[in-house]
A protein has these predicted regions:
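N-terminal "arm"/small-domain region of PLP-dependent enzymes with the aminotransferase-like
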Residues: 1-31, 355, 416, 420
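Phosphate-binding glycine-rich loop
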Residues: 31-78, 92-94, 102-104, 126, ...
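PLP-dependent aminotransferase class I/II
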Residues: 36-43, 48-54, 115, 119, ...
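Conserved coil-to-alpha-helix start sites within the AMP-binding
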Residues: 85-90
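Hydrophobic/aromatic ligand-binding patch that stacks against planar heteroaromatic rings
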Residues: 91-93, 152, 193, 241
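Active-site phosphate-binding strand-loop segment of PLP-dependent enzymes
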Residues: 108-196, 201-203
């Protein structure tokens, strides 16, 4: 039997404009980490999300690293950060010799819990040891609840940095995540809703901060005719060729969001009657892009856990992936403090990301949904049969243990001797 075509989790989806812009870069010989496409990409990105200033960089990780440096994070500082995230949100904290303190999620959006963050900041304020910054991660295409987080940071004068690497196209009360904190980081990795193959963007309303970021990303070279350096810099600039790809991608952002939200709606309709399956909620405060459509699976009700389902789908050449393993459960961060943790732990124990690419066809989505439904129904039926077998065996066992009246007692028709004679 032929193996069906593989359905990937979140593959790149090109618009056709990318080739036009890349060809321009080659024809004009602008293939270095500077050029007209870089400048245009930065300008168009700002226009798209409502930011004032931006610098294109080599990755989302680079953007977070620069943001932390610009926030003044140094060795020995503490930085509060979401625990339910990818390691790239946290690694730059360690690059700088600072200590991450992980903050658990809340149930409504799966993002950082504002109440836990506020309590943590109050505690540190009483000790006179406030963190240098808060790195707020917006997960799977959905904004965190920003208002109370912004208020808590402002109350204690702690710099808020936004990791919006998964949230391009989402909204919070009409605003774009990544534009509300002091600095916002974005990623254009190959699996993102907009990709440059690899790349990132750092945005801010503070022009001086972005100018400094641009300098640091270009090996901190001073504006001199010779190579002059007064601080340590990095090779973090994005090439003109990759920026050309980004321009072609950014032009179709809205259609990509529409397609991913359509994926979610089709999954939800197809799996509505499957018990034990719940979709990541969409918080009331804004638009979820459904960058990933994510479900949680109750093994007691569904008869299958998230890993069983993942393996069953893999056997049908369908790629899925567990949700982020919380950072406080990662061996490399074993000694770090975590505020809460139960929500992120529960999500990791039950969560699964379904194929979510904007190029998926209705046939692809139906194939995935059918495979999920079939797996759960088959496992549930198998479990029901096993339960019946166990009950029958238990009944037979109980019967075998009951006393035999012909052995332990006298039959009623047997006449007993009268011992009084």
């Amino acid at each position: 039997m032929p193996v069906p075509n593989r359905i990937y989790l979140s593959p790149p989806h090109l618009s056709g404009l990318e080739l036009q812009y890349v060809a321009e870069a080659f024809v004009t010989n602008w293939i270095a980490p500077v050029g007209p496409h870089v400048e245009a990409f930065e300008r168009e990105f700002c226009d798209t999300i409502g930011a004032a200033h931006a610098v294109a960089v080599s990755s989302g990780t680079a953007a977070i690293h620069l943001a932390l440096m610009l926030a003044g994070v140094r060795g020995g500082d503490e930085v509060a950060v979401s625990t339910f995230t990818f390691a790239a949100s946290v690694n730059p904290i360690v690059y700088l010799g600072a200590r991450p303190v992980f903050i658990d999620s809340e149930r409504e959006s799966w993002n950082m819990d504002p109440a836990l963050l506020s309590a943590f900041l109050e505690d540190r304020a009483r000790r006179g040891a406030l963190p240098k910054a808060v790195v707020l991660v917006h997960i799977y295409g959905q904004s965190a609840d920003l208002d109370p987080i912004v208020a808590a940071c402002a109350r204690h004068r702690v710099t808020l940095l936004e990791d919006a690497t998964e949230a391009l196209g989402s909204t919070y009360k009409g605003l774009a995540p990544g534009t509300i904190g002091r600095l916002g980081a974005f990623s254009f990795n190959g699996n993102k809703i907009v990709t440059t193959s690899g790349g990132g963007m750092l945005v801010s309303d503070d022009e001086a901060l972005i100018a400094h970021a641009r300098k640091l990303a270009t090996q901190a070279r001073e504006p001199a005719p010779h190579y002059e350096h007064t601080e340590i810099g990095y090779n973090y600039r994005l090439s003109n060729v990759l920026a050309a790809i980004g321009r072609g991608q950014l032009a179709v952002l809205e259609s990509r969001v529409t397609a991913r939200r359509r994926n979610y709606e089709l999954y939800r309709a197809a799996l509505a009657e499957v018990e034990g399956l719940e979709f990541m909620p969409e918080a009331h405060w804004g638009r979820h892009t459904r960058w990933h459509t994510v479900v949680t699976i109750d093994p007691t009700t569904a008869g299958v856990d998230h890993e069983d389902l993942r393996m069953a789908l893999e056997a049908e050449n369908i790629e899925t992936r567990p949700v982020w393993k919380p950072m406080h459960r990662q061996p490399v961060f074993a000694g770090c403090e975590c505020i809460g943790g139960d929500v992120a732990d529960a999500l990791f124990a039950t969560g699964l990301c379904l194929p979510s690419g904007s190029s998926l066809t209705e046939s692809d989505l139906t194939r995935v949904a059918d495979a999920i439904r079939r797996t759960i129904l088959e496992r549930r039926a198998r479990a029901a049969v096993a339960t019946q077998v166990r009950r029958r065996r238990a009944a037979v066992h109980r019967t075998s243990l009951q006393p035999d009246a012909t052995i332990l007692g006298s039959p009623s028709h047997v006449r007993r001797p009268d011992l009084r004679r």
